[in-house]
């Protein structure tokens, strides 16, 4: 191709493609594929989610992604935003959106995501979706998995344990508008204790990644066993 002819996005992907094993198919590097996908994002929020989820899945490396982005001309603003503020500790799209509202819309400092909360005896109380250690504020997104009676009971016990050690929380559920998100975040942060580090009856532990997905055969076996146990009740 003549040097003075601009490359299309598709041509750049093919140019960057690598070949797998002999006889394999051309395969673009994950970072190149993600950059191409970001050009299709309809909003900065969606672009941010795409990057965070690719990082959570382990299919891209953030340093390589940023290096690849520096070599691209006319990168869309939403793509630049998503790569600049990327977070590898969000375990779901809603967590990524929650983080973006917290630090992007409200301009609060970046919190930690999916961290253990530990009491002074060393017991792990919970792993919370979002937590700001300076203020003692945490946030949770509760989707459909939290609607069962047993799950709601566990959630209430967990929230009580977090209150007992002085953490102030907010909860976001499916259907809430981002205006409601902002109100709850601001309200919880204003109620928080803001205790100095040495006076907190809690501390933060390690980051907890998402558990691996079960093998399909194991999932089928688990479902069969649950049906069997239900039949015995």
Region roles according to the model:
Residues 2-63:
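Hydrophobic alpha-helical segments and helix pairs
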């Amino acid at each position: 191709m003549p040097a003075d002819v601009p490359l299309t996005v598709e041509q750049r992907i093919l140019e960057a493609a690598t070949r797998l094993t002999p006889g394999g198919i051309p395969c673009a590097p994950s970072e190149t594929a993600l950059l191409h996908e970001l050009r299709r994002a309809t909003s900065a929020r969606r672009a941010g989610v795409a990057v965070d989820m690719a990082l959570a899945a382990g299919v891209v490396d953030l340093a390589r992604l940023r290096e690849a982005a520096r070599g691209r001309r006319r990168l869309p603003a939403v793509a630049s935003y998503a790569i600049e503020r990327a977070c590898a500790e969000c375990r779901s799209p809603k967590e990524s959106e929650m983080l973006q509202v917290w630090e992007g819309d409200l301009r609060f400092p970046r919190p930690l995501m999916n961290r253990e909360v530990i009491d002074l005896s060393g017991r792990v109380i919970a792993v919370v979706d979002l937590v700001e250690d300076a203020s003692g504020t945490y946030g949770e997104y509760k989707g459909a998995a939290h609607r069962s009676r047993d799950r709601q009971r566990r959630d209430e016990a967990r929230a009580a344990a977090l209150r007992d050690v002085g953490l102030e929380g907010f909860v976001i559920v499916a259907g809430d508008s981002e205006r409601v998100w902002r109100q709850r975040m601001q309200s919880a942060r204003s109620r928080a204790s803001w205790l100095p580090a040495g006076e907190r009856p809690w501390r933060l532990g390690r980051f907890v990644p998402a558990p691996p997905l079960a093998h399909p055969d194991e999932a089928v076996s688990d479902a069969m066993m649950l049906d069997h146990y239900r039949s015995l009740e």
